[in-house]
């Protein structure tokens, strides 16, 4: 599968027009229906190659845009969703530094 | 690691990788893309901003400006605006508070204008060293002053933006850090002051990106 190609599992004769929001690989139990004890095994079955991860992010982004950004009367929500997500991301990658801030009172 | 007032400007993140620079590209996620024929509110808003800027920069460039040369300044504006504005949210790194970024925007731009101007319009560039209406006795001094002012342009452009961003963030952190040792009544006032400052800084974020774009437009219109 080269860059920009359809996923290898996609077959236009079976699936019809290509939908960028859809996963064409072998269907697994949806995450919402996974029992707590099976989460480890479920995660173990995920395809974690860079290609697959990029594909998953791409599908999620597509779905998110269609739900929140593309509608004609889209509100301010997607902006704040992105902002909060970015804030969380930068908080997490800076946590090793930020955790020292609780010692400010001793400075 | 010792944290201090300036740790908000530290690009290094987990494992000492400079991952905080990633925030430079947050704007790419914010640009509304078009899918449906009918534009969404985001598209309408974004288009009207771009159109207004286009008209603004077109008049600044004057009749000698080439078609489409406003695009680079509009892109410059939006890049800086997204960086300035997103940097005001907690934990998000402000790339424009570093000369590394602002100077890498301003210096190549200025260098291109200079090379273009001096190679293609040498006479015109020399003429610019003496502004119209300068008394003859002041002309030698004006040449010196104009030369210096021309050479420091990339520096002033970059430092103006960086200093503004640093000043705003320092003010917010300094004031915010006094909170823990305050009484509850004073904290209410502190909160109000911080909100007012945040509004002010949002305005500064927009104004400074506009200033950067407008000045580079004017510099480009001077060389042809």
Curated annotation (Swiss-Prot), chain A:
Gene Ontology annotations of biological process type: proton motive force-driven mitochondrial ATP synthesis; proton transmembrane transport
Matches recorded under Pfam families: WRW
Entry GO CC: mitochondrial membrane; mitochondrion; proton-transporting ATP synthase complex
Subcellular location(s) per record: Mitochondrion membrane
Record key words, sorted: ATP synthesis, CF(0), Hydrogen ion transport, Ion transport, Membrane, Mitochondrion, Transport
Function, in words: Mitochondrial membrane ATP synthase (F(1)F(0) ATP synthase or Complex V) produces ATP from ADP in the presence of a proton gradient across the membrane which is generated by electron transport complexes of the respiratory chain. F-type ATPases consist of two structural domains, F(1) - containing the extramembraneous catalytic core and F(0) - containing the membrane proton channel, linked together by a central stalk and a peripheral stalk. During catalysis, ATP synthesis in the catalytic domain of F(1) is coupled via a rotary mechanism of the central stalk subunits to proton translocation.
Family statement drawn from the similarity comment of this UniProt entry: Belongs to the ATPase F chain family.
Quaternary context: F-type ATPases have 2 components, CF(1) - the catalytic core - and CF(0) - the membrane proton channel. CF(0) seems to have nine subunits: a, b, c, d, e, f, g, F6 and 8 (or A6L).
Protein name: Putative ATP synthase subunit f, mitochondrial
Protein species of origin: Drosophila melanogaster (Fruit fly)
From Swiss-Prot, chain B:
Keyword field: ATP synthesis, CF(0), Hydrogen ion transport, Ion transport, Membrane, Mitochondrion, Mitochondrion inner membrane, Transmembrane, Transmembrane helix, Transport
Principal place of residence: mitochondrion
Family annotation (Gene3D superfamilies): ATP synthase, F0 complex, subunit A (1.20.120.220)
Annotated membrane topology: Multi-pass membrane protein
Pfam families noted in UniProt: ATP-synt_A
An MF annotation (GO) of this entry: proton transmembrane transporter activity
Protein's UniProt keywords contain Nucleotide-binding: no
SUPFAM superfamilies (UniProt xref): F1F0 ATP synthase subunit A (SSF81336)
Coiled-coil features, chain-numbered ranges: none
Compartments in which it is found: Mitochondrion inner membrane
Domain of life: Eukaryota
Gene Ontology CC, one term: mitochondrion
Kinase found in the keyword field: no
Disulfide topology: none
GO BP term, pick one: proton motive force-driven ATP synthesis
Oligomer status and interactors: F-type ATPases have 2 components, CF(1) - the catalytic core - and CF(0) - the membrane proton channel. CF(1) has five subunits: alpha(3), beta(3), gamma(1), delta(1), epsilon(1). CF(0) has three main subunits: a, b and c.
PANTHER family assigned: ATP SYNTHASE SUBUNIT A
Its biological purpose: Mitochondrial membrane ATP synthase (F(1)F(0) ATP synthase or Complex V) produces ATP from ADP in the presence of a proton gradient across the membrane which is generated by electron transport complexes of the respiratory chain. F-type ATPases consist of two structural domains, F(1) - containing the extramembraneous catalytic core and F(0) - containing the membrane proton channel, linked together by a central stalk and a peripheral stalk. During catalysis, ATP synthesis in the catalytic domain of F(1) is coupled via a rotary mechanism of the central stalk subunits to proton translocation.
UniProt-recorded name of the protein: ATP synthase subunit a
Gene (UniProt): mt:ATPase6
């Amino acid at each position: 599968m080269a860059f920009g190609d359809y996923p290898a599992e996609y077959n236009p004769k079976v699936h019809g027009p290509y939908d960028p929001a859809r996963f064409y690989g072998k269907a697994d139990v949806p995450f919402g229906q996974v029992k707590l004890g099976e989460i480890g095994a479920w995660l173990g079955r995920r395809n974690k190659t860079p290609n697959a991860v990029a594909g998953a992010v791409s599908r999620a982004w597509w779905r998110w845009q269609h739900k929140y950004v593309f509608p004609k009367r889209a509100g301010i929500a997607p902006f704040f969703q992105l902002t909060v997500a970015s804030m969380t991301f930068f908080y997490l990658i800076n946590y090793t530094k930020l955790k020292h801030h609780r010692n400010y009172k001793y400075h | 690691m010792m944290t201090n007032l300036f740790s908000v400007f530290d690009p290094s993140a987990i494992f000492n990788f400079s991952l905080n620079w990633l925030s430079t590209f947050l704007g790419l996620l914010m640009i509304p893309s078009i899918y449906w024929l009918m534009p969404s509110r985001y598209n309408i808003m974004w288009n009207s901003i771009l159109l207004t800027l286009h008209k603004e920069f077109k008049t600044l460039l004057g009749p000698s400006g080439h078609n489409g040369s406003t695009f680079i300044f509009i892109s410059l504006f939006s890049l800086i605006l997204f960086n300035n504005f997103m940097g005001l949210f907690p934990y998000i790194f402000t790339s424009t508070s570093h000369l590394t970024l602002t100077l890498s925007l301003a210096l190549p731009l200025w260098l291109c204008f200079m090379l273009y101007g001096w190679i293609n319009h040498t006479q015109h560039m020399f003429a610019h060293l003496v502004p119209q209406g300068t008394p003859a006795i002041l002309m030698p001094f004006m040449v010196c002053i104009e030369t210096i002012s021309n050479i420091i342009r990339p520096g002033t452009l970059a430092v103006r933006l960086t200093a503004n961003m640093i000043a705003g963030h320092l003010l917010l952190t300094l004031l915010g850090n006094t909170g823990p040792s305050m009484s509850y009544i004073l904290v209410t006032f502190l909160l109000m002051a911080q909100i007012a400052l945040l509004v002010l800084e949002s305005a500064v974020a927009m104004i400074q990106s506009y200033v950067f774009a407008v000045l580079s437009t004017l510099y480009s219109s001077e060389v042809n």
